[in-house]
Amino acid sequence: MEFTPRKEPVIYVVEPYGGSVRKHLPSLPLIYWDDAAVTRGDGIFESLLVRDGKVANIARHSARFVNSAQALELPEPQIEKWKEATELAIADYFGGDETGEAKCTWTYTRGRASTGHPSAWVVVQAIDKKLLEQREKGVKVMTTPRLWHVAEELPAKTLNYAATMATLRLAKGKGFDDVIFVDPDSGIVLEGATSSVVAVRGNKLRTPAAKGILSGTTQAALFEYAQQQGYRCKAKEITPEYLERCDSVWLVSSVRTAVRVTSLNDAKLKAPDNAAEIRGLLDAALAR
């Protein structure tokens, strides 16, 4: 029987200093008006794929989560407690039938200004149908300069996505589905709004090498596995013109997984013969 996603998310609150975890009703408020997540966007998060009852690529997500907390000088996350909350939320969400997919989000903020106590919670919820459609149909993408600077010394996945979301709204208003950011000075490719860019030419997989790019957990898993399967994987400087000449271009991320770029600005990109193979590589990488 096919798994039917729940309408309501499952939420577990995590005690940041390693205490208990507890279930939270989604119909009740969770954070206060003076929480730094609301007033400053001061916090970190990770989006994880749950597939058949298990979190994909959890070691890389956990490592980046800890690094992000360190970069923002938040108390070190007690990862075992986050994993415990995640397992409980997954069990509640799937109700014993651990087939199908879901999205899991870890959120960790600096907390209330009045208490200085961090806020932390885990959510498991249905994957947006639009993301599932994009896996199958691909996305139309426009390139755009990233006009804000990302410090190399702050390699954190923070909650402050306001500028990125504004850029996505602009792109969608122009008929595109997504964006690829480029350096405003050099024009080299950086990353997608919520994804890493991967270009395929023959048996070569390439991803941008540039300053200010957040390390992609999904891209790293893909490259590690693909290398073992005989692909030549490398990070290098990439231009939009290079992408247009490739066999295929992909946006890879944890929940949406691999989405093919069908057009870049005004250029339609050809459909590759090995699209299923590339998706299969990523699925296999995430299943390990």
Task: Name these PLM-found stretches.
Residues 1-80, 84-88, 114-288:
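Helix-start/capping segments and mature chain N-termini
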Residues 80-112:
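Short, acidic/charged, Gly/Pro-enriched secondary-structure junctions
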